[in-house]
Amino acid sequence: MSFETISVIGLGYIGLPTAAVFASKGKKVVGVDINAHAVDTINRGAIHIVEPDLDRVVQAAVERGDLRATTQPEAADAFLIAVPTPFMAERQPDLRFVRAAALSIAPVLKKGDLVILESTSPVGSTEQMADWLAAARPDLRFPQHDGDPDVFVAYCPERVLPGQIMTELISNDRVIGGMTPACSARASDLYRIFLQGECVETNARTAEMCKLTENSFRDVNIAFANELSLICAAQQINVWELIALANRHPQIGRAHV
């Protein structure tokens, strides 16, 4: 089954570039956001966020009629959810936006559709999302209950750096975590529409943990570099020279201090 129409739920720093890249490949893309100002801005061929090269891709896609935005989900062949997952006051992950997005698309789901969660989420979130969808649509079979589902579900985290998103979306490898191997294969087919990197397939829980591991590795490196700067300041050592020298070690240079 081909992907004639793709819906992206959440038109922020990940959702809008993703929608624009799919549209640049000639796919009909419907972006959905509760922010009416963002929707109106995009439909004028402009952008409401700052990201190099995004403006021209969005403008061209809107002018061709391949990209449009709305505040309400519509029927599509694939749905990508890219909404915020902030922390609550007690530092617990807040999945209310994911739940709201899932419930918003549930009425328009049909047999053969693909639903992908891209938001950074705790392990088990994709399964939870699938449960919300199944509860809302008992007439459809989902992968947690049936080996031959009507709706395919996967977790495919973004792996891009702000300021380089339009390049890295296309060139970086993509972790594809389906709830079943068939879900992974279906999600890989979707991303291959624009992806030049490799689709690396795994299960949803491993993909969720992979994204958290990548973020944690970055955070640990930042904290380590900060500690080095404090020590170097106390010892009258140039921290940048130190880092450049340390990165010449073959085992350290691979990770980059």
Could you describe each region identified by the protein language model?
Residues 1-254:
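Structural/interface elements that position substrates and couple domains in central-metabolism enzymes
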